[in-house]
């Protein structure tokens, strides 16, 4: 299939310029600018996609989407409420839990932690926490064995490993709210929970029945944890679930606790896209300078074409293709660089961290301790199209100027 005449002449002009050594500094800078802008935008969007994936896999998969807690603690008639809650449309699973704060001790090392009493069988339906417990510890996690599963950050702080024993001090319940000596319980570290994030440094789990025994709660619990089919509708669903409990309850969802992370990711993605589009735009508009110089350089050729009968539309199309090809080269280079870096972003950052001896994301501050990346080809397509559209826009003025050249004046040497 033959190429359009305008594209063919545009390619000839472009190749001729390169053979003649007329590649201007502005043209090189604009091409490099487009390539860098496209590459950085693809890498940045891939990093944001990675953060969103890890938020879903490491936060939304392990924390309850919603929680219901009785105003009057402990919650004694929770079984009836649980039956009602499980029938609410949109609730995928529900399970009782007990929450309390404890001080865990090993030798001279102390650590304050949030302890959660869970039913091992029901927790597997509620969250993905069991899959983050190292080894097969969850399979042997059961009540009556004085077991505890602690986060890896807690284990490192206490210098303990799976199989060691720790002591945990638990607040002693007193109906008159008098200050009493805390209860001390000796527990066996049954497993280590590794989420590579903030929860590793402050979280532990024990079987629900053991928690009820340690806290003298009988068959009562602190609340009911919920898993929802639509996590972004959590506020409404947890409200619906709270209404069917027939009790005075507090309700909360992951949106109130971790929702800021999702909002921040979306905001940073939008800001990054806007900033990089502006960078690409500045680089593309350097094409204007390049093409204006090219129009002046090729004015004799334009005059000959006009003399041979070329219309204004053909002349415009030639220089639009001329500018578009320059933008296309920079864009394709940027896409190749961006895709390669995005696919290897995590190991690249890990190598840089080892090289400089500094970790960019600390797990005791952020919800993950590595820089994730997930390449979406639709993002690559949008970035490429945006860069080409800006190149096309930048080519229009010089192309229009080329079509207005008077061949008689050029050929007469005026």
Curated annotation (Swiss-Prot):
Homology family: Belongs to the ABC-4 integral membrane protein family. LolC/E subfamily.
Protein name per the record: Lipoprotein-releasing system transmembrane protein LolE
PANTHER family: LIPOPROTEIN-RELEASING SYSTEM TRANSMEMBRANE PROTEIN LOLE (PTHR30489:SF0)
Keywords: Cell inner membrane, Cell membrane, Membrane, Transmembrane, Transmembrane helix, Transport
A GO term from the CC aspect: plasma membrane
Family matches, as InterPro entries: ABC3_permease_C, Lipoprotein-release_system, LolCE_TM, LolE_gammaproteobact, MacB_PCD
Source organism of the structure: Escherichia coli (strain K12)
Subcellular location: Cell inner membrane
Example GO BP: lipoprotein transport
Membrane topology, from the record: Multi-pass membrane protein
GO molecular function: lipoprotein releasing activity
Function: Part of an ATP-dependent transport system LolCDE responsible for the release of lipoproteins targeted to the outer membrane from the inner membrane. Such a release is dependent of the sorting-signal (absence of an Asp at position 2 of the mature lipoprotein) and of LolA.
Stored Pfam families: FtsX, MacB_PCD
Entry's transmembrane regions: 25-45, 275-295, 317-337, 377-397
